[in-house]
Amino acid sequence: MSIILGIDPGSRITGYGVIRQVGRQLTYLGSGCIRTKVDDLPSRLKLIYAGVTEIITQFQPDYFAIEQVFMAKNADSALKLGQVRGVAIVAAVNQELPVFEYAARQVKQTVVGIGSAEKSQVQHMVRTLLKLPANPQADAADALAIAITHCHVSQNVMQMSESRLNLARGRLR
């Protein structure tokens, strides 16, 4: 059993999603958004760090998954996003959590089956996969999708490792 915290970083709204994985079974534990209503970036970063730390304390995840930085047309936006990712990652590392990063395209491909999927498609598939009564908020859905992606990637890595181990055992007999 593993608990995975997914983070969709944003300087105004940072989404989070927490799921439990037991084998191939995924269970929704919680999700939401850290909203920063202050204007100055240092204060926003402080609130995001505190929010992520509080979520980690509440859910006690085993793994931390976050969206990678994408190339933005606006350099200022990309820098702010990088700083938000930084404080979220520091919050995880301070709690001794292993950090995994996934590109937005990989997350959409894993959850929807199309790397260029729309937000509404991600919300719908997250709702379906986690058997939720309604679509989660867009940023929370993205964070849950990141956590789901981590589950699928780690499951595939484990299966490949087991296959290679079994193959090696067969050669040794």
Swiss-Prot record:
In the UniProt record, does the keyword Transcription regulation occur? no
Q: Where in the cell is it found?
A: Cytoplasm
Q: Indicate the enzyme's highest-level EC class.
A: hydrolase
- Which lineage? Bacteria, Pseudomonadati, Pseudomonadota, Gammaproteobacteria, Enterobacterales
- Report one GO cellular component: Holliday junction resolvase complex
Family that this chain belongs to: Belongs to the RuvC family.
User: Which Gene Ontology terms describe the biological processes this protein takes part in?
Assistant: DNA recombination; DNA repair
The protein's name in its UniProt record: Crossover junction endodeoxyribonuclease RuvC
* Cofactor(s) required, per the database record: Mg(2+)
Keyword field: Cytoplasm, DNA damage, DNA recombination, DNA repair, DNA-binding, Endonuclease, Hydrolase, Magnesium, Metal-binding, Nuclease
The keyword Ubl conjugation is assigned to this record? no
Please list the residues that bind Mg(2+) 1: D8, D139
Q: Which gene encodes it?
A: ruvC
Q: Where is the active site?
A: D8, E67, D139
Provide the GO MF annotations for this entry. crossover junction DNA endonuclease activity; DNA binding; magnesium ion binding
